[in-house]
Amino acid sequence: MVAQIKDKLGRPIRDLRISVTDRCNFRCDYCMPKEIFGDDYVFLPKDELLTFEEMVRIAKVYAELGVKKLRITGGEPLLRRNLYQLIAELNQIDGIEDIGMTTNGLLLKKHGQKLYDAGLRRINVSLDAIDNEVFQAINNRNIKATTILDQIDYAVSIGFHVKVNVVIQKGINDDQIIPMVDYFKDKNIEIRFIEFMDVGNDNGWDFSKVVTKNEMLDMIESHFDIEPVPPKYFGEVAKYYKHKDNGAQFGLITSVSASFCSTCTRARLSSDGKFYGCLFSTVEGFNIKSFIRSGVTDDELREQLITLWNVRDDRYSDERTEQTVKNRQRKKINMNYIGG
């Protein structure tokens, strides 16, 4: 283990998010709108994706640099064939203490048991409404919320620790906050509401569509008796609250109204093998895939990863204003390449 590395703003590296595919079986407007990601959209060919062997090699070196947590993302990660094999290999890396996955949940019954047997224990399921019609309008694939709720119940039944992520958009699904808090409170499943972010280039974001953390909290407090919960660790992105009657928790992620750049410890590996220091990056990522395919040693890879982190100075959300979003000259990476 080398000495702990820090970026230009003094932030250590502790988390690595690995996007295993740019494909998804949903077409949510805030991520992959169907008007752009239509039937003729060309996704990455297989040889442009990192292999599992390459992902494991990169993760091993990152573990030597201080990474403790891995998160598998997409696109929709369950579309990557034989994903359980990757989980099993990542689970053997010294120093990795936690592996999670973010998914839309549609294929959990198909793949969940193999993933659990491979060592995956934590899943975040993206579910933006509990009402079938609202959810179908969001995913644009006629998938009912009840279908995903059934998949969540299955995942819990075989032992997974499940959290639910909800991106809230004003006038689209903000009426889902109270019924979803109520539903998952009774299930004692943690739900996290996320402020609508300007990820990618095609989701039509502006401030008028954001429901802030304080607005969400006011809604929830008017219906439930709750109290705040202290953060569990440095860099925790959600502000947590618990119900006083049964202790069930929910979180609010202030990605717009109160940024958490100063405690961000995440490196991101895109589905095409590039390093990014921020979800909102407008700078082309360093191509780790090409670098390792050129025949470099692990020592050379380690030095490159150290350099990439040492020069990191991303703080996009700290600097975001409506004007900077409108005047942005360079495109950001789309979320299907980098995960949420």
UniProtKB/Swiss-Prot annotation:
[4Fe-4S] cluster 2 binds at C261, C264, C278. It holds the Pfam family Mob_synth_C. Keywords: 4Fe-4S, GTP-binding, Iron, Iron-sulfur, Lyase, Metal-binding, Molybdenum cofactor biosynthesis, Nucleotide-binding, S-adenosyl-L-methionine. It is an enzyme of class 4 (lyase). Its EC number is 4.1.99.22. Monomer and homodimer. [4Fe-4S] cluster 1 binds at C24, C28, C31. It catalyses: GTP + AH2 + S-adenosyl-L-methionine = (8S)-3',8-cyclo-7,8-dihydroguanosine 5'-triphosphate + 5'-deoxyadenosine + L-methionine + A + H(+). Pathway: Cofactor biosynthesis; molybdopterin biosynthesis. NCBIfam families: moaA (TIGR02666). GO terms for biological process: Mo-molybdopterin cofactor biosynthetic process. Catalyzes the cyclization of GTP to (8S)-3',8-cyclo-7,8-dihydroguanosine 5'-triphosphate. This is GTP 3',8-cyclase.
